[in-house]
From Swiss-Prot:
Protein name: Ribulose bisphosphate carboxylase small subunit, chloroplastic 2
Recorded name of the encoding gene: RBCS2
CDD domains membership: RuBisCO_small
Record family assignment: Belongs to the RuBisCO small chain family.
Subunit record text: Heterohexadecamer of 8 large and 8 small subunits.
Length: 179
């Protein structure tokens, strides 16, 4: 053990004292000239010329955070028509998910009662009746949503597709918003 330590220290001392040998490794003299590489594009000298894809890109506005709040899956699309709403509900029924209706007068998560998250901060909505187990008709779900809207006109109403085998919520989208 001691002999290997002295051997390492003597090698380290020899490496520090020994002069560099230029014949083993050539010194760095800089990058190769640009003429050695094929040039396929002209060089840009400033910001006057920017890359383009033929004019197909337009500047897109970022969604404003005040006044136009967004919700769940389909909230960035225009309001669903009755036909497209029926198609969405048929999709979740076709996948074997149970349609559920929920409503909330607030519609947004807010921490009015406490600084930590809890039950009354708006993330849990009230269920409208019971889940629609065995429902095979999308029109029945739309009828229930209209009935909920009639009773609570100032409420946000959403449809949830619940997978009762895996016990998870698979889809959720807003069907009614207050005026």
């Amino acid at each position: 053990m001691a002999s290997s330590a002295t051997m390492l220290s003597s090698v380290a001392t020899a490496a520090c004292v020994a002069p560099a040998q230029a014949s083993m490794v050539a010194p760095f003299v800089g990058l190769k000239s640009a003429s050695a590489f094929p040039v396929t594009q002209k060089t840009v000298t400033g910001l006057s010329t920017l890359p383009s894809n033929g004019g197909r890109v337009q500047c897109m506005k970022v969604w404003p955070i005040v006044g136009l709040k967004k919700f769940e899956t389909l909230s960035y699309l225009p309001t669903l028509s009755v036909e497209s709403l029926l198609k969405q509900i048929e999709y979740l029924i076709r996948n074997g998910w149970v349609p559920c209706l929920e409503f909330s007068l607030e519609g947004f998560v807010s921490r009015d009662n406490n600084k930590s998250p809890g039950y009354y901060d708006g993330r849990y909505w009230t269920m409208w009746k019971l889940p629609m187990f065995g429902c095979t008709d999308a029109a029945q779900v739309v009828k229930e949503a209209a009935e909920c809207k009639k009773e609570y006109p100032a409420a946000f109403i959403r449809v949830i597709g619940f997978d009762n085998v895996r016990q998870v919520q698979c889809v959720s989208f807003i069907v009614e918003k207050p005026e």
